[in-house]
Amino acid sequence: MNKLYKKIVCFTLGFGLMVALCGCGSNTPKVQSEGMKSVGSLNVEEAAIYTDDSEKEDVIETYSSADGLCVIERYPTYYDVSLDYGKGEPVEVGKAYAQTILEAVPDFADTFEPYLHENIRGAFNGRKINYDALEERIETLINSLPEDYRDEVISFAKTLSQGEANYAEDGHAEDDYAEDCHVEYGHTEYGHAEDGYAEDGRLSYIEALTMQIIPDALRPTACSALSLGGEKTVSGKRITIRNLEWNTGSNNQMTNIHAVTHMKKGENSITTVGILGLLDIITAVNDDGVMIAILDVGSKEELPFVYNDKKCYTFEIRYALEHFDNAKEAGEYLVGESGDFTWCNNLLCTDEKDAFCCENATKEVAATGKARSVLRTTESELMEGLAWDSPDALCIVNSFATKGNQDGFTGAEFNITRFVKYNKWVKEKDKFSIADAKGLVAREVVDQFVVSNVHNSGNVHTVIVDYATGKIHVAFTKGDHADDIPVFWEVGTY
């Protein structure tokens, strides 16, 4: 294959990224490319050919809970899940979801449990794992969830682990249990909690709770997003693109359980793109077109992890999608809650009219004076040395970008490179169609590690929301890594 090498440094110089030294978190941080190497960008040999339409897969098999609260359709590439909160209480939906998963995917535990433990080991970064401390962390965070979410998650975990988690005859958690969500080893009334964290081929109760809050308790990896306003699109309506990069497991097991989940309550609904069994939000859009997706940022201060009096931001996103019909109010809500989150993060937040990035700093990081929470817009002034040349487009990577905020670009070539590439690609084209948007993630060879790509080996899914039609297009990674030219599927409309 002919591989065209384009120097990253050329991109950097061309778009004015400063290399002068600058202290992290100063009032006017300057982006610098300290430590960058002149390496090539390996492009695909031939340009991808896409259309605005995406094919639809055919259903292989359908599974339903006895009460009809959960329906799972198995497609060749993903699972389509419908959860009906209009016909049942959250605790009943949680139970129905777990029961249907056990029927549809009998080896679900064999798939998810090893992945969960890989994330746990990654969170402890080689240190000896204190499982008692981890259990306390999980219990505390689960207890912080709003009551409906907490009951749903507990019911799901109780059913999936096939234990008896101190439930009343009506299926609701007992008040004392719901209040402190306490699990004690050796007490069989708490289901399989006595097994605790053990890689034994089944998901214990505490493991089934932990899987619901991996981003909040253990932390994700990298992502990027781009939202093109009407002035940059052929249709005159917004197009939003989201790349999720995450650990898919040592055997890429998560690529076998992609899921599109429809959370319905009457006329209202949320469509999430994530992993089968998860009730939090990774990437989602509600029926009003409010789209929110998570991107990790973290802190440069090496502060201790705090979980007491904290909130799970992935469930706060779900709350925002359920209660707000526009991106501005949803974004303002999430920025307002961000001091109580467990990690600093960026949140893509768009609707047909607007695009925002919630630059969310925890109160501990904000107290250092190095970061602050702010709702970034296309008009926000960027930190010194960071160039963006398309006024009607918003780009997000794994760093804050607003002037005066924590600088996660300096010394982070991955962030610099992706931001510069997005800037170049958006600038060089007048208006984008959906086909063009798909083509943005099909420009570079994926299976390489010497350069930083927009569409790279860590990609789990790419979601494109077309505000002209309401269609949701998704490319799911299957196997070792994403395809150089991914296939997009239409998974429904919002």
Each predicted region: which residue ranges?
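C-terminus-biased signal that marks the final domain/tail of proteins
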Residues: 31-164, 194-222, 321-494
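Bacterial N-terminal signal peptides that target proteins for export
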Residues: 1-12
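N-terminal compositionally biased, intrinsically disordered segments and leader/signal-like regions
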Residues: 13, 29, 189, 378-379
